[in-house]
Amino acid sequence: VFFSSVASSAEAWKKDDTITSNIVCLSEETILEVARQDTISFENASSFVQALLQQGRCVSFMRPTEFQVDKVLLTYKDHLKRETFILRINYIFSDNNPFGFTIALQRPTI
């Protein structure tokens, strides 16, 4: 499962990169739980995220919203063995105020 996307470069994510996301989890503990489910299967992760949205532990946006990467927390291999990143993110014009956490695949190549 991945919540985020962006176009440009085949690099790893890094601080100050711009990313769009339509789902953000509000705590590090919650996003780590999502990542654990994502290592098992897409179905596990998807149903788990739906429950988190209902509980208010994650939020979704009507359309993808731009954020800035504050920190790469860790990388892992998802259920399809793809390089996947857990990112702490801020609003673009925020002064070091983390908004939440998201999951993204390695940055795609155009």
Model-derived features: positions:
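Bacterial N-terminal signal peptides
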Residues: 1-5
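Boundary regions of SH3-family modules and the immediately adjacent low-complexity/disordered segments
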Residues: 11-27, 77, 84-110
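Surface-exposed patches in mature extracellular/periplasmic domains of secreted proteins
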Residues: 72-80
